[in-house]
Amino acid sequence: MTQKPMHSSNTLEAIIVQSAAAARPPERMTVSQAAERYREINSPGSYVGPWKNDTTPYLVEPMDILTSTEFTSMAFVGPSQCGKTDMFSNWLAYAVKNDPADMMLVQTGKDTARDFSIRRVDRLHRQSPLIGEMLVGTAEDNVFDKQYTSGMMLSLGWPSVKVLSGRPIPRMWITDYDRGGAFEDVDGEGSGFDLAQARTNTYRRFGMTVAESSPGFEVENPKHILKTRHEAMPTPGILALYNKGDRRRWYWRCVKCENPFEPDFSLLHWPDSEDLKECSENAVLRCPHCNQIYAHDTGTGHPSKREMNIAGRWVRDGQHWMPNGEMHGVPTRSDIASFWLKGVAATFSTWDKLVFKHLSAEREYESTGSEKALKATVNTDQGTPYIPKMLSSDRAPETLKARAKDYGHRTVPPGVRFMTAAIDV
């Protein structure tokens, strides 16, 4: 269907106005600032109004990395319901209004690319007038290609060598990187990320390749000993990209003991009850250092998830977030800025649903032996890789290390000639 032009150029005055707008230098701002300036959300029953960065504060730093010349790639690991795909919409808004350059979004298949174009891109144009007015609106526009008055083009594709090995494009975005293994080996030519990155190489530090996804591959070696605090268990897909990057994780700072910690599903606590609703509705999070209680909602008398997210920080592997706000330590360096957000901190997910789905899946496994529901909730809701039951063991290195007890320093009595030590395994 042919779109009507968004602008009228029937008069000399209109032509002059449009030419002046095209020649005007872009206003200097970050992607997150552009999102608040230009992006409108119209989701009746959920939220209607301008984009607000404090709704998903953990997206600000990854969004602003997209225009950094320090990195050529970004990997974002996160659960569903965290808003990670909105980063692309905000990047597009920034590009259209401030810094035009061709972009391509690669979905898991042709049908999902078409759906993304209709549900995401077209809605962005309709709901955000300042973005929609930049469409050329000619007959050349179609569901897979969008042209803008600045001359930039947005293309939507899917994992195939033909799509991923064409002309150079400075800005590439791969969504749902782990879904169905579609990007693991594209037509025998290599990973989707490597093929996409090859398209941006021409632009060197001004090119950017992004992959985002919740984890989708199983941990194959649960006994692997992690070498750094932020390293992920080795799996293919998005977590492999994360490990190649500078490995940032989202931290909260305890309001009581002031120690930073990563909000993780393992820190949630609930009553010991056969009633799953009772368990999930009373779930709270406890600080791993001092047991301070945190609640999901505000108004409970305990610090809430929203309050903690607003004060949260991304911490690179090798760094330590000090009480005065400074980062100490030597951060891991890489051309890939990589982020890993867990489901407990996701804005649009609730702790009661996380707990209910997990306990329901555990109960299903106990009664049927099926791990499908458990794997799904661990991957997509909790945002972590799944370890199959047959591979999990209480003798895993992390489990044994966690059991260690500090007996302190003892004094050897005078006259002792030697000491022995024995370990029972």
Report residues per predicted region.
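Phosphate/NTP-binding elements of NTP-utilizing enzymes
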Residues: T2-D297, S304-I423
